[in-house]
Amino acid sequence: DFCLSRGLGDVYKRQLEGLRNNQGTERIAVLRKALQDEMDKGAQVFRTHESLEHVLGVIKELRDRYMNVHVDDKGKRFNTDLLEAVELGFLLDIAEVVVYAAQNREESRGGHMRDDFPTRNDEKYMQHTMAYLTGDPHSSTPSDHIKLDWKPVVFTKNEQGELNYPPMERKY
């Protein structure tokens, strides 16, 4: 069940060759730093719908710029420059999924504090958010290529039948 689909290896080889041979002008470190700065500003523990929406817009811009990324090292062995370019693409994917999932969770809980939704909502959100990248992130809005699903929280009990870890609100 965990093997590559037929021909998928060739797809990834072409993607790597495309990155390695791209004649773009965007620097990997500049894009990575811009992503880091925007995530720190708008998607850290304290956030709002507006701050998350802004970060999603920046991620889209960075994705567009990523298509023009330049890899200095053209070698095929031990190419850390190419590795950093690949990792940047994955960082953009993960950042978008995290921000989109946070934007769709309209409550505050744990390390997710929404200033526009300051209280917990156990009735709706006592569950784990599961997010799946399902399409091409370059050609659509997050709702078109990120599928959100939920998995119930499993509560464990001790020998006396009490919850081992009862739900409680975090105070900041």
Whereabouts are the PLM-identified features?
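Glycine- and aromatic-enriched mobile tails/lids
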Residues: 6-172
